[in-house]
């Protein structure tokens, strides 16, 4: 999703200039020109469809995990599988192990075939941009950082002129490359603020599913309720892109990258606060109050607390808006700030932040049970709000730097 550009005074001419999205980060642009979206190429839609298929597979596998981690109280299937007729448990286990290894072998061979085809396809498609090999850029980047560390953590110490003057040494990089590393490090610092954001975002695929299981679902599987998150992302995305951002630009409101991410953090805090409120309502409602599905009135886990599951809807709406403001902007920010040959590396660090967020989620697992869930959501809401404040204080200066760069 393309982020809104800085608002500027309208051009005296009425001509509309379309900016190619692939050139925005590398070509000097007249700030008085209006900013409009370029047409998305068909190849991009193909890649988007493939990515959607991958996400379908990912969530199709991971979402049921929560149900296995916390099976219904009355479920016998979650505990054992009875053999049919005279089959023995040993036979079923042997077949199961064979199926596992056979499936893994099929996956390996299918993946190997797909890789071979993906190497051949670009040779016959003129739409692929083929770049000449430039070698591994990581050793050069490591050398720049090493020089900066020896120079008291100042990147200026890695400049060719500094190395030549102080060490009579010629280096293999230029000032442009050092400045690219400087911008890439800015993106890496911003990623640190997203660790707790990813912890909160992961609640949609675990604890919020369990929360739905404690409510009246009217026959809808509780793991299906979490589908409201991607639904609202799809709905709110165009609303924000086509409605909010142009409106802010029209009124000369500078809603830049750092501002959008900080706003998304506050929205994420609000979604966790609302989830805490929903959990409080569940605990205040019978038949089991703060012990859902476990009291005698639940009839062995069959009767949840009498709260409508669609009370969760605002949680997913706010969470979707937070995801659009913060996560989408992070992807854009890391891509535009990263050095030309290190974009994939810097964006991969975003996934490292997600891994750290998951580690925090594991650490707070002792709170993820009744009747402590309300305090877990409240703690996440407060912590996320504090992160938003600190994030804004530390990184708001980069808004001004971005305006100067543009």
UniProtKB/Swiss-Prot annotation:
One of its GO terms (molecular function) is transmembrane transporter activity. Residues 14-25 have a biased composition (Low complexity). Residues 1-25 are annotated as: Disordered. Its main location: membrane. The lineage of its organism: Eukaryota, Fungi, Dikarya, Ascomycota, Pezizomycotina. This is Peptide transporter imqD. GO terms for cellular component: membrane. Disulfide bonds: none annotated. The chain crosses the membrane at residues 184-204, 220-240, 262-282, 309-329, 344-364, 373-393. It is a multi-pass membrane protein. Belongs to the major facilitator superfamily. Proton-dependent oligopeptide transporter (POT/PTR) (TC 2.A.17) family. It is found in: Membrane. SUPFAM superfamilies: MFS general substrate transporter. Induction: Expression is down-regulated by ralstonins, lipopeptides produced by the plant pathogenic bacteria Ralstonia solanacearum. Expression is positively regulated by the imizoquins cluster-specific transcription regulator imqK.
